[in-house]
Amino acid sequence: MRNKSLDAAKAVAACLVVFIHVSFPGQVGQIIKVLARCAVPFFFMISGYFCYYEGKTAEDKIPSKILHILKLFFISLLFYLVWEYIMKFLSGEDTGEWLKELTDSSHLKEFALYNSTSVVRAHLWFLPALIYCYAVDFFVEKWKLRKAAYCCIPVLLAMLLWRAEFCRFFGGFYHTMEYRNFLFTGFGFYLTGQMIHEYQDKMYQCFVQKHTERHIKWLLIVGMAAGAALSILEYSFQNAREIYLGNCIAVICLFLWLVLYGKEKKISPILAEIGRKYAFLIYLLHPAVADVMKKISHHVGIDSSLCYLWLRPLLVYGITLGMIQGVFTLNMRLKDCSRR
């Protein structure tokens, strides 16, 4: 039976990604953005969770997942190439220079090594990173190295936090793409989700037998709260970062809670459907909606209105979701008509 709490959490995570890219105003907006940084690790964890298979079926399933994400990436890339060209043309920017940048060898190298898509749209990096995760996982399964891969989780997460955060205390510095890529931000969380899936039944049985399931539930809730508080504390000392130690603690505790106890909760079917069907598309399309809203708000003169700035992230999420649902509904009706 599918765990609908994970689907609902995907809908919330998609909303948090919108809050990262289209933030609320002031210091409150920055704190919300800090807490929202757990959304991308969550997406990698849930991808790994649903890519765990018993027996030998993994080698059959993973290639189809790679092809699906590859198709999604090429469609998204084509869309944003056209979209960015139109936006730059309307803004009076040099589109010819931008087109040259697209084929610059340094950008192509950054894409191949670090999944960087900044020259088109930065948020698209997630898709090639996920493809890399699936590809590496294919060989992990093929060569039966899953247990060895699990041993790499703390190493990968430690290297992520070192590059993203702690190296600054010792005068070090890494560019965002040097840690926001499949290996450091992606694969560690992907494997964590996969490992949780493999051992979820054993963990729950162990807690039930020892009569500690209630204590574990509250321990995970405390872990989520402590992780969120630590993230805010880290922000107060270091300002904005791509990810914090507190985010890692919070998202792992949240994921464990959803897997072990989420099935017990009554979940909104609408929220679960949004997460299951539309979360990835919201992630991909919301920047385009934000661009249109920015131009319209500037044209009508409300772009500096405090009321509008507070409503803007919610409007971007709502409009993006409404457009996607509209396209899905229209597509279903067209299919029904063709069958008749």
Over which residues does each language-model region extend?
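Solvent-exposed interhelical
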Residues: 134-157, 195-221
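Hydrophobic, aromatic-enriched interface-forming segments
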Residues: 145-201
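Interfacial loop-to-helix transition and helix-capping segments at the boundaries
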Residues: 28-40, 113-128, 166-189, 230-253, ...
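Helical transmembrane-bundle signal
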Residues: 14-20, 43-50, 77-81, 188-191, ...
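Alpha-helical transmembrane segments and terminal signal-anchor/GPI-anchor hydrophobic tails
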Residues: 201-278, 288, 295-297, 302-309
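C-terminal ends of transmembrane alpha-helices
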Residues: 19-23, 27, 158-172, 197, ...
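Membrane-cytosol interface segments of multi-pass membrane proteins
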Residues: 1-162, 278, 299-340
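Membrane-interfacial loop-to-transmembrane-helix junctions in polytopic alpha-helical membrane proteins
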Residues: 2-5, 25-32, 118, 170-180, ...
